[in-house]
């Protein structure tokens, strides 16, 4: 606004005979009321109460209106009023205060002549705010309920060092974590927390595999330093050391029973050991590359080994000789599992395929499944028909064996998965990744999973990406299903609360 507009000369028709004392008194009342109102707003941060002017201010404004506006010539909102000009010239520092009072007056005028309208609007506004607060509270309560929901699996374990292998104790709630610096960490796990029991320094170089003996009293570890160690879990004392167990770095261990265990190294040598002897009781070199996994069935007559050179090699434990070696595959054979009552062997490969063999006939596969189309490095049998496979993509997927079917995602890691194991009762799956973390997945729900029929229709694309109950992610279909369920519940509630129709 220009200066000449602020200080223009009042017109004769705008002049009002008001004494200076009345003007000063009126301004003082407004200033005091605005100060009180500002203090109230600053102290309580309650903007809802500021919609209507306080009662003392209403009385002051009403008195001023009766005394000054009785002749009808005085309008506080008129910019051309000489009183406004005089007020601005008399007390410029209080312009903000007068402006605040004018806004409060305008709010009062908009509310109507009666204060009841203002109070009704306050009530409506408060009710609206309460409705919004109720919705917010429901959302917050839902989030809190999800956070406080009882855990079905232990929390994550995070280490500073790379985790090379994990193994569950056969009887107790203890898990062993082998690390790249040669240590083994023993954790007691529960759904509430994980507790570090002890750290055992076993090897000078990377500890590549860790296994518990059948009674759970000792740990068997192998290392890049070519040694095998047997350590008492409770006392941490070394019970036996095979300092040069292999000529090359040892990669895999397998406990056969209370007396025997097997080891395989990076050059393909497989050895059989007896806890009671100093040297190996059997050694065979039929593989030219790293032994990736070893397995046996309940009868423990045959020892099977997969290798990075694409062979499945079977040894006769009793006869201590080669049983059969498969035809070579143009891909790495990384992992395997036994299913269907020890009648089927399934092998996972670096190309994401799954080869199925009839037990005892390991020369060539009888079935080939497309798998997950990404390298499969780990496999854990969950039931007689269901396997969990994992690899470089960081996902743990469940597969149904014979007929083959992708069931969905069991769990996820942010980086490639390095090792997996399942506890004795088959309900808890653990996995470690290149992110130095161990995560747990409750897979008990597979016990109630029915058999799949060969001709059953399914969507392979959706099945592969479907998130199972143990997954940390949810399915979009579940989200929209919940929304539809909420809408149906709301409609039912509306129908229940609706009164009888008044139409005739």
Swiss-Prot record:
Keyword Kinase tagged: no
Biased composition (Acidic residues): 32-49, 77-95
Organism annotation: Drosophila willistoni
Record's keyword annotation contains Repeat: yes
Highest taxon, organism lineage: Eukaryota
Name the UniProt record assigns to this protein: WD repeat-containing protein 55 homolog
Keywords recorded for this protein, A-Z: Repeat, WD repeat
Family: Belongs to the WD repeat WDR55 family.
InterPro entries reported in the protein's UniProt record: WD40/YVTN_repeat-like_dom_sf, WD40_repeat_CS, WD40_repeat_dom_sf, WD40_rpt, WDR55_POC1
Bias (Polar residues) ranges: 66-76, 114-124
SMART domains in the record: WD40 (SM00320)
